Amino acid sequence: EIPLRLVGSEMCIRDRENNMPKRTDIHKVLIIGSGPIIIGQACEFDYSGTQACKALRKLGYEIVLVNSNPATIMTDPETADVTYIEPLNVERLEQIIAKERPDALLPNLGGQSGLNLCSELNKAGILEKYNVEVIGVQVDAIERGEDRVEFKKAMDELGIEMARSEVAYSVDEALKIADELGYPVVLRPAYTMGGAGGGLVYNREELKTVCARGLQASLVGQVLVEESILGWEELELEIVRDADNNMITVCFIENIDPLGVHTGDSFCSAPMLTISEECQKRLQEQAYKIVESVQVIGGTNVQFAHDPVTDRIIVIEINPRTSRSSALASKATGFPIALVSAMLAAGLTLKDIPCGKYGTLDKYVPDGDY
């Protein structure tokens, strides 16, 4: 019997690679790396990109990797079939796509820069021009997950509560909205990594400074002005979904520090220690609804806020990609989220992947049996 921490490992894949169903209409896959290490985007994406390359090569695909940072594991010569150390921009990527002619692009394992580049390539018509299919996440799903307006619309349709908020495209608009909501307010720029350019503001002067910075940092010049939920509990779920809409929760993460401390700076525990079973069940039901509506294949990180006084739950945001939390969850549980996500993007389902004592991955539960 293969122990849990070897799920999807080389041993597992080697045992089954000959009879595993996978997509045969794609042969060459382009993976976008995460680029330089900056605050909020570090080695977790090198880890996930390397895992993806390993998994897809084991399944027989040819891998073309593009990354601007040579000081990574994923740019080692043996990780991909072809590796380009090039700037991560649309012009250079078009040249690489024209030369290599990949069948598919896997964007959700290279962090925020991978997702943003995929969106830009799509808008520029390059993916259509060279007939490149996006796997793992649909392009419109990136927008539903990352664009604050689209995400709010999607949540309203699902009947899932969010913090009261409105979108601003200028500092003046943001000032008006903040006056209506009452200070303090949170500013969240769209299409940024780790909340870059945003923050908590307590008065009009702070708002002017932070909002101007946020509008500049946002790929689409859009900032969400949101009611403050300072002091609530911040809770995260790592969900994995396949093409047949089977979903499993890999990990329940409780941030020890309350909302207001960035998740990247907060202590956290997996599994949750002080949250009731009933509350965890509600979180899981809502997370499944969200992941199904966004239709990501592979790992998604869903962040919630819970008011311990009123028991109100609201969704903060989702990351339709491997994230800092998924690297953390992988290490805490022994479940290789990035590796499994890559296999699912290649057309396998959770039922196809063997998993120790559970038999197959669709029966996995995060029982925290250490």
Regions found by a protein language model. Give the residues of each.
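Conserved anion/nucleotide-ligand pocket segment
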Residues: 182-190
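A short linear hydrophobic-aromatic micro-motif
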Residues: 164, 185, 223-224
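Internal, active-site/partner-interface "lid" segment
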Residues: 133-136, 166-171, 175, 355, ...
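Single conserved hydrophobic/aromatic residue that forms the stacking wall/gate
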Residues: 1-15
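Accessory helical subdomains and C-terminal extensions of nucleic-acid helicases
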Residues: 123, 130, 181, 219-220
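ATP-dependent carboxylate activation and anion-phosphoryl transfer catalytic cores
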Residues: 9, 20-21, 27, 46, ...
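A short, flexible beta-alpha/helix-coil linker loop
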Residues: 36-39, 141-142, 191-194, 321-325
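ATP-binding N-terminal substructure of ATP-dependent carboxylate-amine bond-forming enzymes
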Residues: 9, 17-160, 169-176
